[in-house]
């Protein structure tokens, strides 16, 4: 992790609020309140929708303006009236702004996640875009497959348990359900594409428990810059070591699987039993960490530098590792969530990259895990001639600052770039990127480049299913 300087956050102000006609689902009706904010900010630095009071926030349209960022949220006429009354009663601009922001952040959005697993009753719910409502899923002979795919779709990787429960007459979100066409169910495909509305005569619905992920027992310091990480603050981070020497980072995604980068496994690093995974420590020394053995390494067979060393294309730089024994999770060892199906990285979104990489380009590895917070840069900017001149493909994204100074570096490869979001009313971290490549470290207009994990969800899923009992080094093409 290369760090030249610390970039501090700027103060945000809320100068005005304006109303317009708009509805992201029905453009012929409804209203919105658009809260436009102005703030001093670093290039490419943005703001994301967050939750307040645990509500799920989705598709709060963010558009950059000349003075700041516009945060859009949907209101019905009744809600608008309620907010207006609230604003008048509060009588102070500061209190009024607080009310609008609170209401915006509590409004549940349904564009990003089509599937919900309710943590209160464990019922599976799928969004019906035609009726603009959530439906429970009627029990069927496809319950186990559907439950497993559902967990994957929301980024939870694996199913822990599923069951069937009865709902009373008039239950099931107004008595409406989805039934499933079993022949259309498939890993890597959204389950809503196999659903149709039904009455569910059995009155039995599917409930399930997915592997928990993306949660931390210990918070990290909210500092923008490269700093020593706290023990337990990034519990999915691992050190991949070959013959006892740190080579790359990786991310725990389940009790048996690690995600890393394909380029970590060049020809001279392909004797699988010489690899070890160090977990649960901010130090990259075995004496301070749990050590796991590797059974299988699967890398993407279309990672072109492995096909021809003269090819300068780092697309599909991804690999997964299977462990010989399942991990026991604790406060220092936890899996990170994968992106949900259809989830996209957002230009300007802040993320965190962690690793033990070089603290200088020609320097030495860090002894303590480093963390740095950097914004995602748009593909358009990153492909500009003075950046990477069209080398950024759809399977990558860039993150960093125009002036450089903070970046991943040698030794960080394969490690996580995570972003925080809220799903099912719980704040979680998702593995948005894998440290892949870059020109130098922390150079101006040469940000870090990351494998875009959302593009490889079907590949990861297939690799875990097909190679869980296949020891050795394996390669698998796209699915």
Segments the model singles out, each with a brief description of its role:
Residues 2-479:
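Extracellular "complement/coagulation-type" protease architecture
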């Amino acid at each position: 992790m290369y760090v030249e300087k610390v970039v501090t956050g700027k103060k945000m102000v809320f100068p005005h609020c304006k109303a317009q006609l708009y509805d992201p689902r029905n453009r012929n009706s409804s209203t919105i309140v658009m809260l436009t904010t102005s703030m001093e900010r670093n290039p490419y630095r943005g703001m994301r929708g967050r939750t307040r009071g645990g509500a799920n926030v989705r598709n709060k349209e963010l558009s950059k303006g000349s003075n700041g960022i516009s945060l859009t949220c949907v209101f019905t006429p009744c809600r608008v009236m309620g907010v207006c009354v609230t604003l008048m009663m509060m009588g102070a601009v500061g209190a009024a702004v607080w009310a609008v922001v609170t209401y915006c952040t509590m409004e549940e959005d349904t564009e990003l996640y089509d599937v919900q697993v309710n943590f209160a009753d464990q019922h599976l719910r799928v969004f019906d875009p035609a009726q603009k409502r959530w439906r429970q899923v009627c029990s069927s002979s496809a319950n186990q497959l559907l439950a497993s795919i559902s967990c994957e779709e929301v980024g939870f990787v694996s199913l822990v348990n599923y069951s069937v429960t009865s709902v009373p007459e008039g239950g099931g979100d107004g008595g409406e359900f989805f039934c499933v066409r079993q022949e259309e169910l498939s890993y890597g495909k959204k389950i809503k594409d196999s659903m149709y509305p039904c009455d569910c005569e059995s009155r039995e619905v599917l409930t399930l428990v997915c592997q928990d992920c993306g949660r931390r027992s210990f918070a990290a310091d909210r500092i923008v810059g490269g700093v020593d990480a706290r023990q337990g603050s990034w519990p999915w981070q691992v050190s991949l070591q070959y013959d006892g020497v740190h080579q790359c980072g990786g991310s725990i995604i389940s009790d048996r699987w690690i995600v890393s980068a394909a380029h970590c496994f060049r020809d001279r690093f392909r004797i699988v039993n010489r690899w070890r995974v160090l977990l649960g420590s901010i130090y990259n020394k075995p004496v301070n960490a749990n050590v796991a053995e590797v059974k299988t390494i699967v890398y993407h067979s279309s990672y072109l530098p492995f096909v021809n060393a003269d090819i300068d294309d780092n697309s599909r730089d991804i690999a997964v590792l299977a462990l010989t024994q399942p991990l026991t999770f604790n406060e220092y060892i936890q899996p990170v969530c994968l992106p949900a199906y259809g989830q996209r990285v957002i230009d300007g979104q802040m993320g965190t990259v962690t690793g033990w990489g070089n603290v200088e380009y020609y320097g030495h590895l860090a002894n303590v895990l480093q963390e740095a917070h950097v914004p995602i840069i748009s593909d358009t900017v990153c492909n500009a001639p003075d950046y990477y001149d069209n080398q950024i493909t759809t399977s990558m994204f860039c993150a960093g600052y125009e002036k450089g100074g903070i970046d991943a570096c040698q030794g960080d490869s394969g490690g996580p770039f995570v972003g925080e979001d809220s799903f099912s009313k719980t704040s979680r971290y998702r593995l948005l990127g894998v440290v892949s490549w870059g020109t130098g470290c922390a150079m101006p207009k040469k940000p870090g480049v990351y494998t875009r994990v959302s593009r490889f969800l079907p590949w990861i899923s297939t690799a875990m299913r097909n190679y869980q009992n296949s020891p050795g080094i394996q390669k698998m093409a796209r699915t």
